From Swiss-Prot:
It is found in: Cell inner membrane. One of its GO terms (molecular function) is protein transmembrane transporter activity. This is Sec-independent protein translocase protein TatA. The gene is tatA. Residues 46-57, 77-88 have a biased composition (Basic and acidic residues). Gene3D superfamilies: 1.20.5.3310. InterPro entries: TatA/B/E, TatA/E. The chain crosses the membrane at residues 1-21. The Tat system comprises two distinct complexes: a TatABC complex, containing multiple copies of TatA, TatB and TatC subunits, and a separate TatA complex, containing only TatA subunits. Substrates initially bind to the TatABC complex, which probably triggers association of the separate TatA complex to form the active translocon. Its main location: membrane. Pfam families: TatA_B_E. Disulfide bonds: none annotated. Residues 43-88 are annotated as: Disordered.
């Protein structure tokens, strides 16, 4: 009574097909599908960027520790020849 029946929906769909034609409706559906696919790709690439930034933020800390541990080894190597010269 107050709702839309299946017959009313079919009549509206028939009128839309007659007005726009099947080719235009098919291209409209393809455009809409492409837009949804593009939106999903953009959302997933945004998540990938965040994960990549988090991974890059953790890497410099490890690199800085590696450089610091390498410096004392070089200084110890340089001091040994000097101590040998003083003893001779």
């Amino acid at each position: 009574m107050g709702g839309i029946s299946i017959w009313q929906l079919l009549i509206i769909a028939l009128i839309v097909v007659l007005l726009f034609g099947t080719k235009k409706l098919r291209s409209l559906g393809g455009d809409l599908g492409g837009a949804v696919k593009g939106f999903k790709n953009a959302m997933s690439s945004e998540e990938d960027k965040k994960a990549l930034e988090d991974a890059e933020a953790a890497k410099p800390v490890q690199t800085a520790q590696t450089v610091q541990s390498a410096q004392p080894t070089q200084q110890a190597t340089e001091k040994k020849p000097e101590s040998n010269k003083e003893q001779a």
